[in-house]
Amino acid sequence: YMLKKMPEPEQNDTVLNTDADPDNIQVLYLWEEENVPAKTTFTKDMTGYFDDWDFRPYVTAIPVRKGVTPKGAVVLMAGGAYQFRGNYTDSLPTAAALREYGFQTFIVDYRLSPYTQEEGALDVARAVRFIRKNADVYGIDPDDIAVMGFSAGGIQAGEFLMHYDEDVNGTALDSSYVPDELDQIPAHASADGMIYSFYGRLSVGNMDPDWLSEGDLPPTFYVYGTEDPFYDQFEEQYDVLKNMGIQTSRIVLSGWPHGFGSDGGWVKQYAEWLEEIFKQE
């Protein structure tokens, strides 16, 4: 179940060639077929990966129910150590809950190994640009967008916020990438949810205030359990961010391990926090 894949787009529908639909679930490729920024070469003969060599990252847009006034948008990335995306345990049930709390939700199926977290960060940025472009369609303020991720998905959100947000586009990684209409829109997110995750890389949180300050990071909400092998790192980074003056909040689940997904009753409090952050904007 953890390894189950989300449905892919049925046609060649992309965030560039398709109108946003505020009333129905939409599944859209994030990039045009011949214009995907990458530094990694993934060829047909490379097997044993979760995704096939010709995988195209995509976003699943799950809008609020009809008649609901949206409070903002949330972009979700599942965990899986860059070996898989646990959407059915992480992002899908969380998106379903956030939708009931009035948030437009967008699940990003970002690139995994053999790609890097830099390439995945561009996938996140692309989804944010699409939402900002269509803020009116989705009934939100273009600044009321949060990113969040579980484990590796949170590292992915962090990589985006640290190095690939605002005006950075695919050319930062790939000189052959041709910027398009969406790249004119800054990839700006106003909040981050780190669900048993941190700013850094797989298994290693970065505790250097000088490094972290380069990212001009938004308010950040941590959720983690005391039995998580990375518990001490979550605690330390939370304190570092707080001491830097970044707005931080957290839920610590006593006795909980790594990888609990949407369980633990944290989503409601996180939704309330997001609402407060968006009001400050």
Tell what function each PLM region has:
Residues 70-79:
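Short beta-strand element of the alpha/beta-hydrolase
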Residues 200-201, 226-232:
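Acidic catalytic loop of the alpha/beta-hydrolase fold
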Residues 216, 221-224:
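Short beta-strand/loop motif that positions the catalytic acidic residue
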